[in-house]
Amino acid sequence: MYKRQGINITNRNWGGGNLEGWDEVIDVNVKGAYNCALAALEVMRPQGEGTIITTSSKAGVNYSPRAGVAYGASKHAVMALNQLMNIEEGNNGIRACVLCPGEVETPILDHRPIPVPQEERERLIQSEDMGEIVVFIMKLPARVTLNEVIISPTYTRPLQPGEG
């Protein structure tokens, strides 16, 4: 199973945080990942095998000023869920991998405080790139688990004033 969930809020720093936005990010990014994993485990445990691939973010590995507080915290939580799944479910034949991409050209970029120019979007990770990585992971022998895959666009956008 491959699950990709993620939302963010426009006002991302500590000074402008709001509880409603925080709750929405946690509900979608963390609870969404948890609930999808639970549903998959109900099917995979009786089979004695399965692979769960979840998208977190590079913001779940290292803090990113662009990502902000709520998103970064939520993606760190997704990383922890994945680590715990491998510890608890590996002996049941279930493996979990978390993808940690940098900027991906998806609709979430439309909600950035400062829009990402189209010419820069084309240089970011594309959805097809993520798909190829998922296929690669699924083709690995069941005895192999990639716990985390960190993916970066070759092009690194400079941080703009007001982005972090």
Q: In which residue ranges do the predicted regions lie?
A:
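C-terminal helical subdomain
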Residues: 98-99, 118-159
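Substrate-binding pocket helix/loop in short-chain dehydrogenase/reductase
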Residues: 12-14, 21-23
